A protein has these predicted regions:
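Core dinuclear metal-dependent hydrolase active-site scaffold
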Residues: 9, 39-43, 162-197
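Metallo-beta-lactamase
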Residues: 71-85, 89, 119-176, 230-253, ...
Length: 293
């Protein structure tokens, strides 16, 4: 099957022991597992893009990472070099949501135009305006990231998206998922054959999905949707969005990609870098060499 884009999941840090209840709603006292932190590289047709950018291990980003036990952090320059890319090569960045581990390295991508849902940005500004007793709503948010995003608008480097948008790049669509993991989360579909009714779609879920259990439950003989364990919005919205994403992936849950799922390595080719981080290779465009073999 021909692919228009090469697709990689790039781990840039991790939490070695994350409670399972963060991955799966209600899974209390069910142990711990590794939680990779990652972003997606899309390369093809003369374009290099990413889905999210990770966080920067300085200031409040570093403080939050240390509070949550994040280890192994590497900057985009180091991580992207493993697939022959530099941050300056990236021309488009699709921000799934504004949590620090997805949006904290905005200033490391000097030539990129950034896409974010208008609701995601405006509601975090609103949340910052609330009195201190509402501060749980800001869990996972670095206020400096919000201000940097506003400044990107001043620089004319921000596209404020209102709902769904097709073909932001050829075969790449943005889909709103309001009031789910965050106020204005979105996910990204790559129709890698370029067809409108694609037989080769990949859905990049951001944090709408943390783990395979969110799409399949724990009983393979009787699958069900189970929400992630952390959300500003509703479990109902997360479940309905899981159904929508699965349909966009042609019913193949393995084509719905959660960057926090360590077990992607069991489904796709991967390797560990010298820094101890994993690259997972989902697809290779024509003429692209494997970065994991």
């Amino acid at each position: 099957m021909k692919n228009h884009y090469s697709l990689w999941v790039m781990e840039y840090a991790y939490v070695a022991q994350q409670p399972t209840s963060l991955f799966v709603y209600g899974a209390h006292n069910q142990g711990h597992r590794k939680m990779p932190y990652g972003y997606i590289v899309i390369k093809g047709g003369g374009v290099t893009a990413t889905i999210d950018v990770g966080y920067n291990h300085v200031a409040y980003g570093k403080e939050m990472a240390e509070m949550w036990g994040v280890a192994g952090w590497q900057p985009p320059q180091t991580v992207l070099a493993e697939v022959g890319v530099s941050p300056s090569d990236v021309s488009r960045v699709f921000i799934t949501h504004a949590h620090f581990d997805h949006m904290g390295s905005l200033d490391q991508f000097p030539n990129a135009t950034f896409y974010i849902q208008e609701r995601e940005l405006s509601k975090w500004v609103w949340s910052m305006s609330l009195e201190r007793r509402f501060r749980w709503l800001m869990l996972g948010i670095d206020p400096a990231d919000i201000m940097k995003t506003v400044d990107l608008a001043r620089q004319k480097r921000l596209v404020s998206v209102d709902g769904d948008r097709e073909d932001v790049l050829p075969g790449i669509d943005l889909h709103a998922a309001f009031d789910t993991h965050t106020w204005g989360s979105m996910y990204v579909t790559v129709r890698n054959d370029g067809a409108r009714n694609s037989q080769n779609s990949w859905v990049f879920a951001g944090d709408l999905v943390y783990a395979h259990e969110n799409l399949r439950g724990t009983d393979p003989s009787d699958p069900q949707y189970v929400p992630v364990g952390l959300a500003t919005g509703s479990q109902f919205s997360l479940i309905m969005t899981a159904e929508e994403m699965t349909k966009r992936a042609g019913g193949d849950f393995t084509h719905v990609i959660p960057v926090h799922e360590e077990r992607l390595k069991d489904l796709f080719p991967s390797r560990i870098t010298k820094a101890g981080l994993r690259i997972t290779e989902l697809a290779l465009a024509d003429g692209e060499s494997s970065r994991v073999r």
